[in-house]
């Protein structure tokens, strides 16, 4: 793909998104595509936004990035809360700047809502710390069941979907602030600019074995030591980072409530459950073009297939 004059955004340049479950090789394909298409990579993994969360998020090292510019890595401190609305703003700015340089933006990640926020027409309601604090206090005083009944009266769709207290409080906060149900802010499947979504699929049993091996490699590469260092910086109290896959399990090792073997098994199981949710999320989007991550020609075959998909748009 030939690049137009730098500094002038070319609306013919598509946004390429590489999506799919954890462990399928998305980062490797994104690098290969960026090199092939004269592109730059934009991170859409919510946890790779955090500085210091490297081993446990499989963040590529500078050497592994092979000279390809990367955006939205290491932009948050561990105590900060990740915001999908802020990510949307920053990701779209990065994409526009890349296209303005005449290069191809390659978005990569498995955080479904973050990907949709970057790609699709979606509006995010604001937040209010005072309203949230009041709702959190009500949760402590009145209990989850009472607040769930209140939510069901004004937003039955959200009441059926909320899986934890954080989402329950958020749904009530949104209704308090806007008078609208949280479900009314759900994204449309409508791209805000020309986009090609490429998904990586893998046989479930093969992926499960890869995930177990991946956790073992992370532990060998110093994941427990990483968690110990992050604990000193506020990992336990972090509203987002502290709940990342594997990190609570390793914090339990540090405080003596679990063995390393138990933490490993729990992490592997949690990661497998997470990839199941990712398959459901991305599989529900008919716009995703799926490639077999087990291509017999490896990364070269995947890259060639992805380039053909981009060229066909």
UniProtKB/Swiss-Prot annotation:
Q: Top EC class per UniProt?
A: transferase
Stored Gene3D superfamilies: 1.10.20.140, P-loop containing nucleotide triphosphate hydrolases
Cofactors demanded by this protein: Mg(2+)
Q: Where does substrate bind?
A: 22-27
Q: Where is the signal peptide?
A: none
Marked site (Interaction with substrate tRNA) residue numbers? 111, 132
Role of this protein: Catalyzes the transfer of a dimethylallyl group onto the adenine at position 37 in tRNAs that read codons beginning with uridine, leading to the formation of N6-(dimethylallyl)adenosine (i(6)A).
Protein family = Belongs to the IPP transferase family.
Q: What is this protein called?
A: tRNA dimethylallyltransferase
Write down the species.
Kocuria rhizophila (strain ATCC 9341 / DSM 348 / NBRC 103217 / DC2201)
Q: What is the lineage of its organism?
A: Bacteria, Bacillati, Actinomycetota, Actinomycetes, Micrococcales
């Amino acid at each position: 793909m030939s690049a137009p004059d730098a500094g002038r955004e070319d609306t013919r340049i598509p946004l390429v998104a590489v999506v799919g479950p954890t462990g399928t090789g998305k980062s490797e394909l994104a690098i290969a595509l960026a090199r092939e298409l004269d592109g730059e990579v934009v991170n859409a993994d919510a946890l790779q936004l955090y500085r210091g969360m490297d081993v446990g998020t499989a963040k590529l090292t500078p050497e592994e990035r092979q000279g390809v510019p990367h955006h939205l890595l290491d932009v948050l401190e561990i105590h900060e809360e990740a915001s999908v609305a802020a990510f949307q703003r920053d990701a779209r700015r990065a994409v526009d700047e890349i296209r303005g340089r005449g290069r191809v933006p390659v978005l990569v990640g498995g955080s479904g809502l973050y990907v949709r926020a970057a790609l699709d027409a979606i509006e995010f309601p604001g937040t209010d710390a005072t309203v949230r604090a009041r709702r959190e206090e009500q949760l402590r005083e009145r209990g989850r069941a009472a607040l769930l009944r209140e939510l069901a009266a004004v937003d039955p769709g959200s009441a059926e979907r909320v899986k934890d207290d954080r989402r329950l409080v958020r749904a009530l906060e949104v209704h308090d602030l806007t008078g609208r149900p949280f479900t009314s802010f759900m994204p449309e499947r409508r791209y805000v600019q020309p986009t090609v979504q490429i998904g990586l699929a893998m046989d479930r049993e093969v992926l499960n074995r890869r995930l177990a091996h991946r956790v073992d490699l992370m532990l060998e590469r110093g994941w427990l030591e990483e968690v110990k260092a992050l604990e000193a910086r506020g990992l336990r109290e972090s509203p987002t980072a502290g709940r990342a896959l594997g990190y609570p399990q390793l914090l339990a090792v540090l405080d003596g409530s679990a063995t390393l073997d138990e933490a490993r098994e729990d992490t592997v199981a949690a990661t497998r459950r997470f990839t199941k949710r990712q398959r459901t999320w991305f599989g529900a989007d008919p716009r995703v073009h799926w490639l077999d991550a087990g291509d017999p020609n490896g990364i070269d075959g995947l890259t060639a297939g992805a380039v053909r998909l981009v060229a066909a748009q």
